[in-house]
From Swiss-Prot:
Keywords: Coiled coil, Nucleus, Ribosome biogenesis, rRNA processing. This is Pescadillo homolog. InterPro entries: BRCT_dom, BRCT_dom_sf, PES. GO terms for cellular component: nucleolus; nucleoplasm; PeBoW complex; preribosome, large subunit precursor.
Length: 582
């Protein structure tokens, strides 16, 4: 009655997957080319639910891909280009072996190439999709831009990554999109808001580093190849939204200001323009000169109370954001040669400040250290020989902390030689019941407009409290001794009959405290009964939630106790030092 009976492993999940070797043979590609193709197209291996069935009863470790993904790759134009390149390499090797140099030149001129434009359009149908997926591209391009020009990576890739990252930084500066900065062990984390999307990326520190041997640079280079194409599309579109010329050009006025006397000493002619752009100290040229327009304001429509509250909250948030964009506006900074120039210049320019540095350090310095209009000089050394009275000498952390606090923090904590406050991460948001460090509480008080208590006053208060405690202890011991004496005197006069005081029930009295207590007892009883009436699943979930809350409370108490012990130890050390001095 039925059709032919199918053999084992010819139906079901066994037919949905294909091994890597079979897929490679189907596409007629080498393993390296197959990996490149999968990275570029976004095809990843899958772990089958029933691995033994898919592996036809074998338990040997194998990599599986979905069969539909491999069929999708069969029609990819890049596969043909990979085959052409393989033939090109074979012909080139033959020409080298026969010493046919004219043939070598001809082959090099006709080297097969390919573009990834169609893959980018296929993987990211809309511009917002591309923006959401740009975090990894930014981090990878910034990493490659810091590489030394050795044989590990192609020089063209490093140069391209450097150009694209400089274009991105100039866009963020012009649009003032930067929101958060954090200095970590890995590097500097930045977060910008671009067209409503929060984009976070990591920039490594500008240190000389050796290339690790346990990293596959071919895989990284393949990812970078795709990311640079994507990055180019995004930069072009973003520059269009701001009416900027792409590729970016300096404003004619700014370019004349940056014209150095001995420009050829700093960089070659081919690199000088990129160096000027990477200085981030000048404005970019626009397609059409923009006329200053009034700031866009939200229209007010008569709405219900909830909608009105939401609108007011949005207006307040927009005002705070506009104020944050102008955080350093009107300030003039000078960077000493020992501070990280690029990161500080990038951050300060993002918030409207003017920045300069020593002209012998880098192209782009617009004014000298002797300029009397400088308001802040950023220094990372214990002391300065020559200081000007009309400016603040601060450590670099003040800039990063002020950006995260969305306000200009007091400069007294960041003077030369002072112990810096801890650098708090802006990416950590405490929930109810979480441990909040005292420095964060102090910062929140500053944001509310409250004046924090000085440390010296706190120390004096602590000393006064300790003295009061000593006096109280003495009084308490004296009272205790007096009571003992009275008890011994009254022992002979005690009566044999004892009167026990009666207990009044809380519901029999009409006091406010008893009513509150009665309500609390009723609520506790209702809660207990509700827990008793829960189903088994609900009870399990409730117990899990309560266990999590208790665990967080224990952790908070542990951290608070550690902090208190640390503060007590530091206070004891200070007292010992004072006692030694006296």
């Amino acid at each position: 009655m039925g059709g032919l009976q199918k053999k084992k492993y010819e139906r079901g999940s066994a037919t949905n997957y294909i091994t890597r070797n079979k897929a490679r043979k189907k596409l007629q590609l080498s393993l390296a080319d197959f990996r490149r193709l999968c990275i570029l197209k976004g095809i990843y291996p899958h772990e089958p639910k029933h691995k033994k069935k898919v592996n036809k009863g074998s338990t040997a470790p194998r990599t599986f891909y979905l069969l539909k993904d491999i069929r999708f790759l069969l029609h990819e134009p890049i596969v043909r280009k990979f085959r052409e390149y393989k033939v090109f390499v074979r012909k080139l090797r033959k020409a080298y072996g026969k010493a046919e140099w004219t043939g070598v030149e001809r082959l090099r001129d006709n080297k097969p190439g390919y573009k990834l434009d169609h893959i980018i359009k296929e993987r990211y149908p809309t511009f917002i999709d591309a923006l959401r997926d740009i975090d990894d591209a930014l981090s990878m391009c910034f990493l490659f831009s810091t590489f030394a020009r050795t044989g590990k990576c192609h020089v063209q890739t490093i140069t391209l990554c450097r150009r694209l990252t400089v274009e991105w930084m100039n866009y963020v500066v012009t649009s003032r999109s930067l929101r958060k900065v954090f200095l970590s062990i890995k590097g500097i984390y930045y977060q910008a808001e671009v067209l409503g999307q929060l984009i976070t990326w990591l920039v490594p520190y500008q240190f000389a580093h050796d290339h690790p041997t346990d990293v596959d640079y071919r895989v990284m280079a393949t990812f970078t190849e795709m990311y640079t194409t994507l990055f180019g599309f995004i930069n072009f579109r973003l520059y269009q939204t701001l009416n900027l010329v792409y590729p970016p050009k300096l404003d004619s006025k700014a370019e004349s200001e940056l014209k150095a006397e001995h420009e050829e000493d700093y960089a070659m002619d081919s690199e000088s323009y990129l160096e000027k752009l990477s200085a981030l100290s000048a404005s970019l040229a626009r397609v059409v000169a923009t006329v200053e327009e009034e700031e866009n304001q939200l229209d007010n429509f008569p709405t219900e109370e909830e909608d009105q509250e939401n609108m007011q909250a949005r207006e307040k948030e927009q005002k705070e954001q506009e104020a944050q964009k102008r955080l350093f506006e009107g300030l003039k900074f000078f960077l000493n040669r020992e501070v990280p120039r690029e990161s500080l210049a990038f951050i300060l320019r993002c918030f409207g400040a003017e920045v300069s540095w020593d002209k012998s350090l880098c192209i782009g310095g617009t004014y000298e250290v002797t300029d009397e209009t400088i308001t802040h000089q950023i220094v990372d050394r214990p002391d300065m020989d020559k200081q000007y009275i009309n400016r603040y000498y601060i450590q670099p952390q003040w800039v990063f902390d002020s950006v995260n606090a969305k306000m200009r923090l007091p400069v007294e904590d960041y003077f030369l030689g002072t112990m810096l406050p801890p650098h708090l991460s802006p990416f950590v948001e405490e929930k109810d019941g979480d441990y909040v460090p005292p420095e964060k509480l102090k910062l929140m008080a500053l944001q509310r407009g409250e004046k924090p208590v000085q440390e010296e006053d706190e120390e004096e208060e602590d000393e006064d409290e300790e003295e009061d405690d000593d006096v109280d202890d003495e009084e308490f011991t004296e009272e205790k001794n007096l009571k003992k004496m009275e008890d011994t005197r009254a022992q002979g006069k005690t009566l044999s009959v004892k009167v026990t005081p009666g207990k009044v029930k809380p519901w029999e009295t009409g006091s406010v405290g008893n009513k509150v207590r009665l309500e609390q007892e009723e609520k506790a009883e209702e809660k207990r009964l509700a827990i008793m009436m829960m189903k088994k699943k609900e009870k399990y979930l409730y117990d899990k939630i309560m266990f999590g809350k208790k665990r967080t409370t224990r952790e908070v108490n542990k951290l608070t106790a550690k902090r208190k012990a640390h503060e007590d130890a530091s206070k004891a050390q200070k007292k010992q030092k004072k006692a030694k001095k006296q």
